């Protein structure tokens, strides 16, 4: 069992984690590490020490989840559409990768979307934020529109995403 957990598959993460904790459990040189925020402090707890640099042993970093940061805004005022992409290990970003968001056009009218969110922050962490400013009274969205994120949603756009093993991630895809 010396190499238990040395795989990039979700099944390698500790089994007892809640769904929320699985998204915050990342591979680091120490092993599987759980990141938590308590008050204003960011804490990391080593859950499983592998005896080897897990961030190197698991291969290319993978997207484990994508969440919308902004869930609603007033169309008359405009707002920022943001999403957070979670990787299973820390990554370094250069340039401006992009995230595509599909608009189902459920509201009145048609022809809205897709929306392209540009990389905004998060390099050297496992959480990358992508954002798009939408101006006041813009036709980009309408009431009742449903926005979704597909499987092949991240494009490098001439930039790079590199994991701790210095592997350039050529086609970041979400797991579902």
Task: Annotate each predicted stretch with a short phrase.
Residues 49-64:
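Proline/serine/threonine-rich low-complexity linkers at boundaries of modular beta-sandwich domains
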Residues 167-171, 175-176:
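Single conserved hydrophobic/aromatic residue that forms the stacking wall/gate
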Residues 85-119:
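Short, surface-exposed alpha-helix to beta-strand junction/turn motifs within ectodomains of secreted
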Residues 77-83:
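Short, solvent-exposed loop/turn segments enriched in Ser/Thr/Gly
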Residues 17-22, 27-30, 50:
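N-proximal, low-complexity, solvent-exposed accessory regions that precede a main structured/catalytic
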Residues 64-74:
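Short, solvent-exposed loop/edge segments of extracellular or virion-exposed proteins
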Residues 1-22:
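Short, intrinsically disordered N-terminal pre-domain segments
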Residues 4-5, 23-27, 34, 129-166:
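Contiguous beta-strand segments of beta-sheet-rich domains
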């Amino acid at each position: 069992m010396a190499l238990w957990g040395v795989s990039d598959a979700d099944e390698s993460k500790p089994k007892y984690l809640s769904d929320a904790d699985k998204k915050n459990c990342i591979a680091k040189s120490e092993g599987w590490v759980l990141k938590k925020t308590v008050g204003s402090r960011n804490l990391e707890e080593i859950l499983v020490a592998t005896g080897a640099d897990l961030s190197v042993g698991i291969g290319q970093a993978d997207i484990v989840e994508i969440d919308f940061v902004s869930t609603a805004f007033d169309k008359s005022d405009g707002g920022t559409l943001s999403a957070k992409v979670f990787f299973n290990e820390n990554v370094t970003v250069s340039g401006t990768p992009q995230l595509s968001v599909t608009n189902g056009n459920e509201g009145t009218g048609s022809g809205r979307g897709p929306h392209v969110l540009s990389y905004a922050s998060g390099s050297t962490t496992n959480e990358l934020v992508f954002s798009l400013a939408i101006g006041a009274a813009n036709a980009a969205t309408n009431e009742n529109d449903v926005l979704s994120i597909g499987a092949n949603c991240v494009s490098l756009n001439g930039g790079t995403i590199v994991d701790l093993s210095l592997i350039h991630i050529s086609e970041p895809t979400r797991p579902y």
